[in-house]
Amino acid sequence: GMKVRGVYERSDAKVREQEGMERKKGFIGEEFPTKVLIQENGVKYYVDVAEGQKTGFFLDQKYNRLAIQKLCKGGRVLDCFTHTGSFALNAAVAGAEKVLGVDASALGVEQARENAALNGMDETVQFICEDVFELLPKLEREGEKFDVVILDPPAFTKSRNSVKNAVKGYREI
């Protein structure tokens, strides 16, 4: 079997404090570079397990990313809330003509651009750092059209108190 030298623990979500649990983050066992290279569905990614959003890469979305490949060949694709570009890059692998990935996080967009370069997709995929809620009406006014629009927003609520605002946010997009 595989011998594990070290693990990077990310038990640092704010919800742990709400549940009365300690927030922890760091190495268990041997230390290693926290920026790791992974491959999924024919796409390579750099994932920063220490500084990335949550765990840095959402493994539970593997089959959704694969499903996107079936929809995008030859099309123009808009990937909203792109994070590190995983849906956008899967669209490009599938043969999308042009892909625009949008995220409000400068760090996420920087990582997405790095992942596009890693896969030789800099020409097909463009990533911009903008607020999706401001960009969508602007694209509509400019007459931009897309064959596929990917909406994978972050959670708009983490508690009952903000459900009303969350529903408003989901309706808006």
Predicted regions and their residues:
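Conserved alpha-helix/loop element of class I SAM-dependent methyltransferases that forms part
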Residues: L59-G75
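Local beta-strand N-terminus motif with an aromatic residue
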Residues: V4, G74, K145-F146
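Non-catalytic substrate-recognition/targeting regions of SAM-dependent transferases
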Residues: G1-F57
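Conserved class I S-adenosyl-L-methionine
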Residues: G74-H83
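Conserved SAM-binding motif I beta-strand of class I
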Residues: K98-D103
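Conserved SAM-binding loop of SAM-dependent methyltransferases across substrates and taxa
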Residues: T84-E97
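Mobile active-site "lid"/loop adjacent to the S-adenosyl-L-methionine
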Residues: D147-I173
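S-adenosyl-L-methionine
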Residues: L107-I150
